């Protein structure tokens, strides 16, 4: 059974399938990463650099946690937040047209 999270805003609820979105090491471009960080609540330079090394650079979780002296549990929590945010952004993307993209 898939894990779902219900997000409710102004009485409108929808299901967001968390497992549809997976962020693997090295799976993200630098532009995609910084756009995602830009809409996140993550502000720590150390945490941002750790996530960048993992998601863009393809470094292992162990390497990143050691390099940035990050607790593995905090790494998992932060990565989970980015996974949920990425899934939400992917669900929102069809509502925006190609003409509205300033980065193409």
From Swiss-Prot:
General function of this protein: May act as both positive and negative regulator of pap transcription. Might positively regulate levels of papI and/or mbf. Its autoregulatory mode of action involves differential binding to separate sites.
Q: Please, one GO biological process term?
A: regulation of DNA-templated transcription
Q: What is its main location?
A: cytoplasm
**GO cellular component term of the entry, any:** cytoplasm
- The answer to keyword Repressor applying to this record is yes
Keyword annotations for this protein, in alphabetical order, are: Activator, Cytoplasm, Fimbrium biogenesis, Repressor, Transcription, Transcription regulation
Q: What is this protein called?
A: Major pilu subunit operon regulatory protein PapB
Query: Could you name the domain of life of the organism this protein comes from?
Result: Bacteria
Pfam name, any one = PapB
Q: Which residues form a coiled coil?
A: none
Where does it reside?
Answer: Cytoplasm
Query: Could you tell me which species this protein originates from?
Result: Escherichia coli
Q: Return the InterPro entries for the record.
A: Adhesin_operon_reg_prot (IPR004356), Fimbrial_Adhesin_Reg (IPR053721)
């Amino acid at each position: 059974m898939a894990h779902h999270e219900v997000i409710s805003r102004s009485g409108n609820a929808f299901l967001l399938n968390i497992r549809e979105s997976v962020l693997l090491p090295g799976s993200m471009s630098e532009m995609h990463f910084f756009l995602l960080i830009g809409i996140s609540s993550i502000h720590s330079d150390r945490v941002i650099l750790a996530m960048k090394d993992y998601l863009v650079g393809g470094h292992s979780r162990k390497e990143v946690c050691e390099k940035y002296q990050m607790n593995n549990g905090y790494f998992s929590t932060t990565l989970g937040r980015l996974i949920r945010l990425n899934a939400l952004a992917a669900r929102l993307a069809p509502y925006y047209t190609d003409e509205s993209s300033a980065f193409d």
